[in-house]
């Protein structure tokens, strides 16, 4: 059963009463909220995501609530609760969707240490995952979104979830938060129905959430093997540049973009070393989105990659000293 199989009134009632259970990638979420503005947005943007039986178990138990008190009289706000605990300040209520998406990112960042987590966009084609670690503002979300609507499978625009035991990337296809100048760029490339409401004055400027293609959501149980590691940067008006990196450089750049490399200890080092050892990365800067996508179409091999092991790392960097 999917979100679209519920009527909007039934979805709103379920969210108000006992909440709904749903799945995104490997995670199950229990969401409760009485905010009337959220059900219509979720019904449309989450239409292809799977609903789960309400058996009480979920990885994340989430509530979005309007706080009470003197401030509520002059400014309407919303608070994100995980297991009935609040860990950060409330958001303006008009950007409740952004808080839900950001809060779920926080939940994964804090708890999903069964994976090596890298701040990266990930798309897949022909069995190969293209991992694109990048700092905020690099344009990775826009590049991921454009590739996803050009026939690539979106695994995530935010998290590369790497399984240490086999180096596969676990899909976590979420709404893609398009920001500021990227919004009109993607409006020209995707159906309007896939775009969420315009959310002004967020911490990152104006945001519009883009729903992943149906195929990416439907195949969210299919892991992918790494095929290339790119560190992308959008440089408006500048020529495309592809500059290969050595294994040590790739290792250092990956660790700089990892959420939990140090937290998971030796397992993190071995997994990161194996990634850098098998797939040395490259700097990738581009000033034209169409040119970048055309280049990437020809970058990955057409055959599915072999399965490497963490033990078979090739020549990798030594454990860095502290």
PLM regions: where:
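Glycine-rich, often acidic-flanked micro-motifs
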Residues: 2-44, 57-59, 121, 125-134, ...
């Amino acid at each position: 059963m999917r979100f679209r199989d519920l009527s909007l009134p039934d979805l709103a009632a379920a969210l108000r009463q006992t909440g709904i259970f749903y799945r995104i990638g490997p995670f199950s979420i229990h969401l409760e909220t009485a905010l009337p503005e959220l059900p219509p947005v979720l019904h449309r943007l989450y239409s292809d995501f799977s609903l789960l039986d309400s058996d009480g178990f979920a990885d994340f138990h989430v509530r979005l609530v309007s706080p009470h008190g003197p401030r509520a009289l002059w400014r309407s706000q919303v608070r994100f609760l995980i297991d009935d605990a609040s860990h950060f300040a409330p958001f303006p209520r008009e950007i409740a969707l952004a808080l839900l998406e950001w809060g779920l990112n926080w939940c994964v960042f804090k708890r999903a240490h069964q994976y090596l987590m890298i701040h990266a966009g990930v798309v897949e084609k022909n069995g190969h995952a293209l991992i694109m670690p990048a700092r905020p503002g690099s344009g990775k979300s826009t590049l991921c979104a454009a590739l996803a609507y050009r026939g690539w499978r979106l695994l995530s625009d935010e998290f590369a979830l790497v399984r240490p035991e086999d180096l596969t990337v676990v899909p976590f296809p979420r709404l893609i938060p398009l920001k500021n100048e990227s919004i009109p760029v993607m409006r020209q490339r995707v159906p309007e129905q896939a775009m969420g409401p315009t959310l002004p004055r967020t911490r990152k400027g104006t945001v519009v959430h883009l729903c992943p293609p149906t195929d990416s959501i439907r195949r969210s149980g299919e892991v992918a093997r790494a095929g290339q590691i790119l560190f992308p940067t959008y440089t408006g008006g500048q020529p495309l540049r592809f500059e290969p990196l050595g294994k040590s450089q790739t290792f250092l750049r990956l660790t700089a973009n990892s959420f939990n490399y140090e937290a998971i200890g030796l397992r993190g080092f071995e997994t990161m070393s194996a990634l850098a050892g098998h797939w040395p990365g490259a700097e990738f800067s581009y000033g034209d989105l169409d040119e970048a996508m055309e280049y990437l179409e020809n970058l990955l091999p057409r055959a599915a990659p072999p399965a490497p092991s963490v033990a078979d790392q090739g020549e990798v960097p030594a454990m860095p000293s502290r």
